[in-house]
Amino acid sequence: MTEAAAPASDIPPFRYTADLADEIERRWQDTWEREGTFHAPNPTGPLADPEHPRAGAEKLYVLDMFPYPSGAGLHVGHPLGYIGTDCFARYQRMAGRNVLHAMGFDAFGLPAEQYAVQTGTHPRTTTEANIARYKAQLRRLGLAHDERRSVATIDADFYRWTQWVFLQIYNAWYDSSAKRARPIAELVAEFSGGSRRTPDGRPWGELTDAERRAVVDQHRLAYVSQAPVNWCPGLGTVLANEEVTADGRSERGNFPVFKRNLKQWMMRITAYGDRLLDDLEKLDWPEPIKLMQRNWIGRSTGAHIEFPTSAPDSDAEGEPRISVFTTRPDTIFGATYLVLAPEHDLVDTLVPTAWPAGVPQAWTGGQASPREAVAGYRKVAAAKTDLERQAETKEKTGVFIGSYATNPVTGAQIPIFIADYVLAGYGTGAIMAVPGQDERDWAFAEVFDLPIVRTVQPAEGFAGKAYTGDGLAINSATPERGLDLNGLGVAEAKARTIAWLEAGGHGSGAVTYRLRDWLFSRQRYWGEPFPIVYDETGAAIALPEELLPVELPEVDDFAPRTFDPSDAESNPETPLSRRRDWVEVELDLGDGPKRYTRETNVMPQWAGSCWYELRYLDPTNGDRFVDPEAERYWMGPRGEGDCGGTDLYVGGAEHAVLHLLYARFWHKVLYDLGHVSSFEPFRKLFNQGYIQAYAYTDARGAYVPAEEVVERSGTYYLGDVQVNREYGKMGKSLRNVVTPDEMCAAYGADTFRVYEMSMGPLEVSRPWETRAVVGSFRFLQRVWRAIVDERSGASRVVDVPADEATRRLLHRIVDGVRGDMEAMRFNTTIAKLIELTNALTRLPETPREVAEPLVLMLAPFAPHVAEELWRRMGHETSLTYADFPVADPALLVAESVTYPVQVNGKVRGRIEVPADAGQETVRAAALEAVAASLAGKEPRKVIVVPGRMVSVVA
């Protein structure tokens, strides 16, 4: 009979049960909240508290990746990282540090908006209800957050400062010579003072207001661009590259995504490519995460090469040049044609009205004119995903645009094609095709019967087509033009080619990035409005700070206009654009009342999470987004060369590129502009693993309730029906969700916390086993029984010394636990506490000198029962700020040492000698122990390895 099923009379009145755990936990949670136990004092301002027990102490800022409050609430996998950081933060408070640990909510985004569209319920209503549910669930777990610092990105007093940060970025430009952002006003001063040339060389005073504005806007870190974007008709919005899956579909909804040229807000994150890459070396992050960011940034060294063009009968003025970037400029002698992305800006300029004489029919796409060929091909290409366009296995397609370019090193006229395997968003959107050294170019050349020139000597025995390896340059000389690469290795050939290009004005050495500028606008409702209006000329104007926040207005229809998922030619229509009384506004921006039009896009969900860690530091400040002194105290650099940032940031590895890269970019801009002292937001990153679960399917493949499945002899059954077991994530659709609420009801929050922390290393994924939770419950019951008499409720703790063996065990455990806690090895900590508890329960009475350290070491994991036991042992204040136990070094030294004794390589005995015994004493004891094995023989050699073993050679 289980305890839960046993008659109440059979259970001792003061036994630790789920009901008692619930009463204890709720009482202590109320106490902590009432007394502000986990409030962390700031150095100054309204959150300062000079009387706090940790005022002036060494600080520690522990941060969780804050959750999106979904309607489903938490399952047991979600709190794993939150419990881990709570255990770490609780330990650090007891170790003497002033710990800031807060929790907020990343609450804007598409799920709430989609739910609003389906139900008509305002997204704020559902989101606030979800936040309330999350708060209740997290509170039930006993998480020690400073609730005064909680924020939600949907609150106007929070997104006011999100808008303010956007304006700092908008009103800044990146000075590549200084390698930092500077205010736009300083750029204008350089233009007007003549120290910086305008793009066309005219004096600043000769430019019209519109021309000046255009020049300045080209430098802004936040700017509007008519650019190729990921348009998703099925969602009715554009998406960032990072929100598109590898197969070219939307991450949310799985709709097809198309490349379209649309007017959108962008952020010039590419300006920070080098710093984002180089500063990874200063971060204490997992190496796989750093590698993912390095690959995403994708720095490449090579050259930009300019190819002059000629376009008979086209509308082109002069000779437009096509710029390509290549990592192998040394292969330019093999460039026999150019390929542009169908969306490339120069295509329309270069297309003539008629085909040149002698154009092969295969090049024309069967069309009567270049313009018809280009239009037809573009339509087909727009319907393909990026993955489909770049598939290695597909047959190469394309059309000749009717114009030629000049290869600068050979002088040869080479045809210009458009083809879908070149993407506008990567590089310059144009490539020089070298079929001899590139497999895709070779395949294209074969389809269109284009020349193939090898410029690298293939390895001996090579019988393939394109040779992509290294080798000496061949067919790479035009002496009359002053360039001869034949016989050179790749590195020298590249260097010589770049020098020749730069000397002749044909190109230059360059570094490029896979990283693209960040698409920052969304055609949605549920997001931060932009603090931007447009005047009668369509010029963007930043609103002054005193007009912030620009609040999100009420609307009748929350949905952006969506389209047939395959309608690539559709155009965005935003929900805010339908609130004309909000869109069209009269404002006085310093030159009298005028009519303006508001920006009707909203910011992406990532905006609030780019800076929320700063608002936790000073959440009530109405004058600044964060007080500089608070930022320096909690996030400032520790010394010369230190990057600063949070001391610990815990979250899932799935955010390796998106959130982490965007947040680093925003933080660096704020650092450049003098708003923060740290140049990285997160000094140390820790990725927790995932809690996964078994799911079960019947013969139809339908999921069945996991809790109703039983195992019999290694086979799984639902009733009498055999089912299949699979392992993976936990989810409602898989019918295997277990919630923290269920576990707290069955065992208490402390048991749930101990179980999650004991399942394995925090960074490793692990399977959830509901049946195993009872083991953690029984452990806490043993701790309780060691200290509390289950019949009377009286304390069993006595003020008598522990025996020597128990005392030495205690200090060994304390020493090990401290090391484990610092390294976040929580599972091994709990194993040590179980070992100590088992030893304690074998004693006839419980010595205080063992019980109190045990409870203090247990407190980070099971804080409620630890507080209760601490109080029952006679303490009147919370153990939150009690000193964590420290081991006595003298008790860590063993009194005796056990030596295995080998004879001719086999262990024949063991001896125990005093720890300070000399070698002769050890030798004599060893020989005595194996005398029978020696059978009277005199050993030839006796080797004593101090503290480890004795080896006897007979």
Swiss-Prot record:
Protein name per the record: Leucine--tRNA ligase
Organism: Salinispora tropica (strain ATCC BAA-916 / DSM 44818 / JCM 13857 / NBRC 105044 / CNB-440)
Record's GO cellular component terms: cytosol
Assigned keywords, A-Z: Aminoacyl-tRNA synthetase, ATP-binding, Cytoplasm, Ligase, Nucleotide-binding, Protein biosynthesis
GO biological process: leucyl-tRNA aminoacylation
PANTHER family: LEUCINE--TRNA LIGASE, MITOCHONDRIAL, LEUCYL-TRNA SYNTHETASE
Binding site for ATP: K732
Enzyme Commission number(s) of this protein: 6.1.1.4
Sequence similarity: Belongs to the class-I aminoacyl-tRNA synthetase family.
Reaction equations catalysed: tRNA(Leu) + L-leucine + ATP = L-leucyl-tRNA(Leu) + AMP + diphosphate
Keyword flag Nucleotide-binding: yes
Location of the motif 'KMSKS' region: 729-733
Main location: cytoplasm
InterPro entries, A to Z: aa-tRNA-synth_I_CS, Leu-tRNA-ligase, Leu_tRNA-synth_edit, M/V/L/I-tRNA-synth_anticd-bd, Methionyl/Leucyl_tRNA_Synth, Rossmann-like_a/b/a_fold, tRNAsynth_Ia_anticodon-bd, Val/Leu/Ile-tRNA-synth_edit
Gene Ontology molecular function: aminoacyl-tRNA deacylase activity; ATP binding; leucine-tRNA ligase activity
Domain of life: Bacteria
NCBIfam families assigned to the protein according to its UniProt record, in alphabetical order: leuS_bact
Pfam families with a match to the protein in the record: Anticodon_1, tRNA-synt_1_2, tRNA-synt_1g
Record motif 'HIGH' region, residues: 67-78
Compartment list: Cytoplasm
Gene3D superfamilies linked: HUPs, Isoleucyl-tRNA Synthetase, Domain 1, Valyl/Leucyl/Isoleucyl-tRNA synthetase, editing domain
